[in-house]
């Protein structure tokens, strides 16, 4: 009973270990693709974000370098009334190595709302007498500037969204007729046709000759008719003679046991028995707990 209990316990432990192992393997097979897909999605998103950030940083640095390399000719209007000469004017110095003009102006904005009329200003003081002009009335035409070389191409921008699906194409031209194929197999027979029209009536036959009547042979017997109704019951018969005696019946059940009889007379004396064995003295061995005899046997 103890061995069977141990076998059942070991069997339960083995089945439990196999079941947990199967569940663990199935869980790994299910969760590993999901984790890999999620990590791949995060990696792709981070790569797109880093690419976009790098592109934005490059655009900002290009704008900063472009602003640094712009000429100072746009400050002419601010220094028009100063005594100092206009700085950075490539047209005055006569050199056109770095006089790249700015790009064309952008499109005109929408006109603003008309402002409110201002108050009339106070009359100004009489001005000082003017000085004679020191420069000729006609401005000196500056030499034309050399066209600047085309800059290097900028970094590729981020991929744009997919375009709209195009319009469906026009249907193609009809194909040419193929060559006639080989004749097909013989078809199944068609349905039966409609019955034909009745034929024309035939000519009248030859009249029969009159002969004396001859009686024919008797026909075969007909089938048996249905069974008739049952007749009325007859008169009761006379009593028969007595039969032979029947066989002997089975034995009856056993009766109650009788009372014990008187004791019998004592029997004669039996034959004398065989002589007994020689007596021995047993010795006890304390090594294995056995009892040995002088004749060397162990009983």
UniProtKB/Swiss-Prot annotation:
Lineage, opening ranks? Eukaryota, Metazoa, Ecdysozoa, Nematoda, Chromadorea
Q: Which family does it belong to?
A: Belongs to the cuticular collagen family.
Q: Does the keyword Ligase apply?
A: no
Task: Print the keywords alphabetically.
Answer: Collagen, Cuticle, Disulfide bond, Repeat
Q: Where is the composition biased (Low complexity)?
A: 164-181, 251-263
Q: How does it assemble?
A: Collagen polypeptide chains are complexed within the cuticle by disulfide bonds and other types of covalent cross-links.
Q: Which stretches does the entry tag as region Disordered?
A: 105-282
Which residue stretches does the UniProt record annotate as biased composition, category Pro residues? 129-162, 182-195, 215-233, 265-274
**Which Pfam families does the protein's record reference?**
Col_cuticle_N, Collagen
- Per the UniProt entry, what is one GO biological process? collagen and cuticulin-based cuticle development
Name by which UniProt lists this protein: Cuticle collagen 34
Instruction: Output a single Gene Ontology CC term carried by this record.
Output: extracellular region
Function, in words: Nematode cuticles are composed largely of collagen-like proteins. The cuticle functions both as an exoskeleton and as a barrier to protect the worm from its environment.
> Repeat as a keyword?
yes
Region of interest: Triple-helical region: 216-278
Q: Which GO terms describe its molecular function?
A: structural constituent of cuticle
């Amino acid at each position: 009973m103890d061995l069977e209990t141990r076998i059942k316990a070991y069997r339960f432990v083995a089945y439990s270990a196999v079941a947990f192992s199967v569940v663990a393997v199935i869980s790994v097979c299910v969760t590993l693709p999901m984790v890999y897909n999620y990590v791949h999605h995060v990696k792709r998103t981070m790569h797109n974000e880093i690419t976009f950030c790098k592109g934005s940083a490059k655009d900002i640095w290009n704008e900063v370098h472009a602003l640094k390399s712009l000429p100072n000719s746009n400050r002419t209007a601010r220094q028009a009334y100063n005594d100092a000469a206009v700085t950075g004017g490539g047209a005055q110095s006569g050199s056109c190595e770095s006089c790249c003009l700015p790009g064309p102006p952008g499109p005109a904005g929408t006109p603003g709302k008309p402002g409110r009329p201002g108050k009339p200003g106070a009359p100004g003081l009489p001005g000082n007498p003017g000085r004679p002009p020191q420069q000729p009335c006609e401005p000196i035409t500056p030499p034309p500037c050399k066209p600047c070389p085309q800059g290097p191409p900028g970094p590729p921008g981020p991929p744009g969204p997919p375009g709209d699906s195009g319009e469906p194409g026009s249907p193609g031209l009809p194909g040419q007729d193929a060559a006639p194929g080989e004749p097909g197999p013989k078809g199944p027979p068609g349905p039966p046709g409609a019955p034909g029209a009745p034929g024309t009536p035939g000519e009248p036959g030859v009249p029969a000759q009159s002969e004396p009547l001859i009686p024919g042979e008797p026909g075969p017997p007909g089938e048996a008719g249905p069974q008739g109704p049952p007749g009325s019951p007859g008169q009761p018969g006379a009593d028969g003679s007595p039969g032979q005696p029947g066989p002997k019946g089975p034995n009856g059940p056993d009766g109650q046991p009788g009372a014990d009889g008187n004791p019998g007379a004592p029997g004669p004396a039996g034959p004398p028995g065989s002589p007994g064995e020689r007596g021995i003295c047993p010795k006890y061995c304390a090594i294995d707990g056995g009892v040995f005899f002088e004749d060397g046997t162990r009983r």
